[in-house]
Each structure stands twice: as structure tokens, then as C-alpha cells.
Amino acid sequence: MARSQQRVPHSGVPEGRKSTQGLIYPDIPFPPSTVQQLPLSIALDKKILSDTQRSSALVPNLVNDLFPKASFSITPNVIVKLCEKDFYDLTDWKWLYYPGSSKKADREERAYATASFLNKLTRLCWLLYRDNQRPLPGVPRRWSVIESPRLLADGSKVASCGIALAEAGPDDMQWSHMLCDVQIESTAKGISLAVQKLTTGAAHVFATQDHRLFHLGLALAGDTCQLAYFDRAGRVLSPKFNVHKHPVLFARAIMGLTVLDKAFLGLDPTITLREGRRFLEVNQQEYEIMETIHIKTAMLGRGTVCWRCRCPSDDADYVIKNVWVEEKEEHEEGELLMHVQQVAELRLEADELVLRPDGEPYTTTRVRESHEGGKRPIVPYWIPDLVLRRMVLEPYARPLRDFSSKEELLELMLDALKEHEKIYEDLHVLHGNINDDNIRAFDDPVLSRRRGMLIDFANAVTVSGQPATGAANEAVGTSPFTACDVLLCPRQVEYGPWHDFESFLYVLMIICATCSGPSNTHRQGFDIRKSPMAPWYASDGNRKADIMYLDSDAKFRAFLDRTFDPYFDDLKDVVCELRTLIMFRKNRQPTHVDVMTVFYNHIRARQANQARTTPSSNHAPLVAGAKHNGNGRKRRGDPTPVSSPSLDASAGAPRGMTTRAKSRAAPPREPSPASDESDHTVVQTPPRRKTRASTKRAQSDKQTGMATATRAAKRRKME
């Protein structure tokens, strides 16, 4: 047979699916010379397996629901009849080339034999479709043997030899290529173990494929088969069945995976490919996907995916966010964003449900509500009903880790704190999920530097009272950045701004531990999950609290010495001061002014120190964060710190600060040496374009003028 000449990247969506007559399934030599290795690329623990098991449902007609008879040009029962004698023995009710459970072969041999059988069956289906001039996918798919670590229920990892379905192409298999995951056990007793191993594959597929709506896995244990369907609400299983006694059902599953469009396999059909470029549509406006900027690695839950997209009509960049939300709360995030954008930089341009080709919304309940054949599915009541929404947001902003200098890192966090204060004071809302991904840097058209902003208000907490607090819940926070009190007692604690302040502190600590310089320079050979900060990532609230609350100043400083990259040695003072202010609350809780004072004074000290150590010349000194002069360098006109309207440089330390904090706020007697950042790359982003939201911002600025004056008066009274 001649190979197909059509080749596209595994992650792409092939063009030209309608006219594929004459395409011959490639005669690919199989098995390949080596087993494809798939290492783990995301952190997994036994909780993901227990959560998946807890959210598991049994749907009697799952295979028929996923691959309905009407979707096949040649039905599975016709295929089975055509396979008589050559591939399936109707007399003995047995697939002729299927590896028997009685064979005493090792796992790798069994995987090769099973993959060979599946490829032969797939090739037979393709040839029958071709000979009858029926439509076929644009790129052939093949089954390849893979080896990968798999997580078990007890938290241990085992090396597993299985099979992956992917589009035919290079042999460098990756998780992002996988269309279906197959786990194999030698006898029927191992079916539960095979299903258990499929969870690892599902988690990696969701974490590496931004266009995934659901994922399918196949468990083969001896002659027993079970189909597993994974989505953001959990897992759905088909009943177990014998591949020999139910040949049509087995053929339906294999044909659905290999001859139908990839939408049947869980890929989003609303994302289209034209000339190698991806497009999607929101509110009847088409956008081109320029890059994927975020994929939520947690398999269960909201499954947030964010893209940087460009609108052809105004040539502006936007962020488009895909998110699964509770059906009963589907409008809440959009309504909250409309409220928050009165004072925040984040703007909501469009918000709508993502619809299936039949006009119905994408939901996680559809597959769980099948009543075909009179058998009701077994679905636990606690499984959430999720719907898929798509939002268009602006401005597009860079991650905090793209800071160009340590001074800019502090400035961006200070900007985010100022915005946090506005939202809290004016709108009585707390962010509730401060982390290193939700603080962003955008090019401000007014200031001569990038400015920090907050994104993702999905976990926001509405507050009231004095001081204004709200009810915390299990959805608040991202584990490594969550305040100790919230980790230990999420349902009892009254969530206040000081909990978000603690998250700001952890953002700074984690960046100092995982980066080794500006411009998102990753720290080589360092695994934070194996470092002294491991309790942050293990959700160990007790150990985390011991370090933050109980360790002496000297012991905590030693903890930072063991954890921080040397590049950030001169930021340890900032972290220690913030820890004293936020964690050691004596007579009152810290305020926004208290926390911002720490940041502002350290920024001012660094600027003053740079002014003293920079040799004089005919040109203004260069600093990061100043206005671009057109040749890739940055210029500062005046080294004197500019007084902030929300934090007067001439003001003393706010009342209520600890003695240590007051001493920190005073001008330094012996400034620490300035860090040399001349050998690091300065991150530059294109100037921000004027977009549809520019006029909205001008209107909201007028509305918030009075609120800003009120806050300034409060600070004067406090000081």
C-alpha cells in the first residue's frame, strides 16, 4: 500500500475532511523498533484518583451514546459480517488475531500483540470505507505501544506498558498527540487496575491539549473491555463486556475512535484550522488564536484555558477564556466582571455559552442522562452540572514572572495591591485567588512603564461589616498560595483582606524560589516540591503554619537561605518584613496601607541606592521599567522617586505598625548593594493599542474619582 502524502502536526485539525476518497490507509511498519516513552509532565497525587473514583458514574449505553449508529457510513454490524472467516470467526464467536488471556507473555509482548490487532482492524475498516467511497478523516490514525508511569490509588507509581492512538506521523509520541489511551492487563481480574491507570493519561491529556472537551480511555483486561469517559466533572464508565461475545459493540468503539471525526473523540469542533492557523468565534466575531497562555492542570473543576487572540477588525490582542462553570451559576462570573471593571483594569468584551453543532450548549450532564434501553445511569448526586462558557477579555497582559528587574517585580505587585484596595474599598469584593498567574503586567498608555493588574475573579468573595469580611469556601485560593487559616479551617474562617495579603507574600516567595533571574528565567535543577517549601504544594497547612507563625526570625531567615535563588538574596528583607506585618497580628489586622508601605519603601530605597551608585554622565541613567527610547534601552528622566497618590512618600509609617516594621520604613543607614542586572534580558512588549474598551475606562475613571478621594482622606486620618 502507498503511504498517504498528507502530513499535519499532531495538535492540528486537518483540513479537507469532506473529499478523502482515494486516501489509502498507510502501510506503516508495525510495531516500531522502540517503545514510545511518555514521562510524567505534571504533578499528581493520590487525591486525583480518589476524587475521580468518587465522581465516577456508570452509564449502560455509553458506547452507543458516544458513537451513534447514524454517524457511521458503514455500520459496525456490517463490518463484523464482512470480517467473517478472515478476521472474526462467527462459529466460535472469536476475533482471530486478538491476543488470548491464556498466553503467558510479558506486558510488552502483550501490548505489541494488542496494538497489532487494533491496527489490522483499523486498516480493514479504512479499506472498506475507501472501497465504498465513504468519507474518511484527513490523516490516518494508528495505535502505538507506549510506556509511562501510572499513579495508583495508594499514591505509588508503576511503569505501565500500554497503547496510544494518535495521528500517523513521526514516532516522537507526546501526551499532546494522544487521541485515546489504552491500558492492558492480562486477565479479567485486572480491569479495575487498568481503569485506575487511565486517570493518569486523562490528567495529562487535559493538561497538554487546550482544545479538549473530554477524553476517552480503553481498559483491556484479558477478553474484558471497558470504555472510560473523562470530563471536568469526573469519570463515566461503560459496563464491562467481553470483546468476543459482543463483537459489534467492540467494533463500534474501535471504529468510532478511528474513522469518525475527532469531535467524537473530544476535540473542540468550534476551533477550526485554516492554512495552519487556528480560529474561533465569539458573539459572531472571529478571532485568531495566537498562543495558548494558560491551561489549568487540574483535571476536575473549571478546566480554565486562556488564549491570546487577535481580532482582525481592529488588529488588537485580547484574552479569550474557556471555562466550565456550574450550570446554576453560569452568569455569575460575567456579572461580577462587569461590576469589578468599574475600578479594575480587566474588561469584559463578550461572554456566551459554547454551543454544540446541534445548537445545544456543551454540558457535563448530557452524557450522564442517557436513558436509552430503559436502563437508568448510576450518577452520584454530588457530581456538578457544568456548562462551557467563553469570555473575551482585555487588555492582554504578560505574566508576573516576565518582570524585567527586581525593582519592577516589586512595582508590579504594588500596582496589584493598589487595584486590590480599590476593589475592596469601593465594591466590597476580595479577589480570593491571588497567585503568580493572576497578577499580570500590561503596558499602560499613560505611565512610562508597565503596570500590574489582577485577573480571574471567579473565586471572589463578597464582604461586609467592619472590617469587611466574607465567608470563605473550599473554592477560595490556589493551594500553594492559600493562607494558612483558610487551608486549616476553610468553612470556619471569616475571609478578610489579610488572607489575600498572605497570598501576595507567597507569590513573592515562590517566584524567588523558582526563578533565577528576570524574563521568566527558570531555576535549573530545582524542584520546589522537594524543597523546604514542599508543604505549600502538598496542602500541608499545619507545617506551613509552623514555618510562617512559629519559626523565629533567625530560623525563618535560614529557611529563606535554603529556598531562595541567590539572585533574590536582597529581597529576603522584604519577605521578612511582610511576614512580620501579616502573620504576627497583635492588636489589629494589617491594612492595605501597611502592606503597600513595605513595598513602596523598599522600591524607594532601591531607586535611591541606584541613583547614588550610578556614575554621572551626559545621559540619563538606564533603569528597567522606564519609557522605551526606541533602541531596546530604557531611560529614566529623574532618579528621584515620584510620590504615589495613594501612598505619599513624605508620610511616616502608618500607625499600628510593629516596631520592626517602623524601623524598616525608615531611610536605610547603609543601603544594600545594588544588584547587577545588566546581563539579563529586558522584557519588552509592543505598545498597547487603543481598543473598544478605551472609552469605557474613561467613563469609569470619572465614576471612581470620588472613591479615590475618600480613600486618600482615610489614609490621612490614619497617619
Regions found by a protein language model. Give the residues of each.
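Eukaryotic intrinsically disordered, low-complexity regulatory regions enriched in Ser/Thr and Pro
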Residues: M1-R398, K406-E411, L427, F442, ...
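Catalytic-loop of the protein kinase fold
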Residues: Y424-D444
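Short C-lobe core helix of eukaryotic-like protein kinase catalytic domains
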Residues: L414-E425
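Activation loop
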Residues: A483, E494-Y506
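Conserved activation segment of eukaryotic-like protein kinases, specifically the C-terminal portion
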Residues: A471-C489
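Activation segment/activation loop of eukaryotic-type protein kinase catalytic domains
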Residues: F442-G477
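Long, cytosolic, alpha-helical-rich C-terminal regions that act as interaction/scaffolding modules
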Residues: N520-R636
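Short conserved helix-turn element in protein kinase catalytic domains
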Residues: Y506-S516
